[in-house]
C-alpha cells in the first residue's frame, strides 16, 4: 500500500510538472485578457480575428476570454491573484503596479513591444447633448455655475485619471502655477454630481440615465455613443487642450508561464500592431499608432488636438503619487 501510494504521488507530481507543457502543445488554448472598461467592443471584434489567424498559422484553436472594469480595479485583481495571461489597461502605472507589487512581469515590460507597448492611443473629449444647450466649448465652461460634469472616480478608473490630468494640465498651462491648477480642478469637482467606478458606468450615467450636461469621455466612448444612439442625440466638443492617452498592453509572464501560454499570449499582443489590428483599432475609434495601416476614412474621423503628454506632468509614477495615491491632490480636494 505504501508503494502504491508513493507511485500515485510520483505520478501526480509528474503530471503537475508537465501540465503547462502539455497545455501549450495541445490543440486547445485559452487566454484571459484583463482589460479596462471601454475596450469591450474592440476586443469583441479583435479576438475572433486573432483566433482565426492563430488557427491558420499553428493549427491550434485559441479562445480569448475577457474581463472588463475600471483599470485600477483590474490591476488590483491581477495583483490579488486573477490569472490574466495578458493585460490591456488604461495607463502604464497600472501595469507598473502589477509588476512592482506581484512580480508577475518584469519592470521593463514596456520595452518588449513597439511604442512603449501602446498599440493605439486616445484622448479626452467632451460629449454634450445635441445643440450643446449649455454652450460648452472649452475647459473654462465646465466650472460655470449650473453645469453638471460627469466623470468617473480616479481612484478606480484609468479614464478618470486621464480626465483629471487633462483638466490639471489645461489649468497649469493657462494659469501658470500649481495653485491655479489646483483651484481649477477644485471648482470642476464641485460640479460633479456622482463618481462612477469606471468609464463605461459614467457613459451610461450620462447617455442612458440622462444625468449631467457634459461627459468627460474617452474619444472612442464619445464616438461610440453617437454611433449607437445617433448624431441627433449627442455631439462631440474638442477642447483647446487635451491629453494624449496611450493605453499599454503586456503579457503577465508568471501566469502565462504557469498556463503554458507564453507564445500565444505574445502573439496576441503583437497582432494588435498588425495591419488588421490597426484597422480594427481605428474602426473602433482608437487612434492607431500606425495610421498608414488603417482605413483612411476611419483615420480621417479623428480631429486635430493640441496635446499635452503625461511626461509634461512628470510621468505616471510622479502623477500617481501626487494626485491619486492616498492623501494626494484628489483626496485633498474631493474630501474637503
Which positions does each model-derived feature cover?
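N-terminal segment of the mature folded domain
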Residues: 26-156, 296-299, 334-335
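Short helix-loop capping/hinge motifs at secondary-structure junctions, enriched
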Residues: 131-137, 156, 169-177, 255-263
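N-terminal signal peptide c-region/cleavage motif recognized by signal peptidases
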Residues: 19-21
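Ligand-binding pocket segment of bilobal, Venus flytrap-like solute-binding proteins
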Residues: 174-240
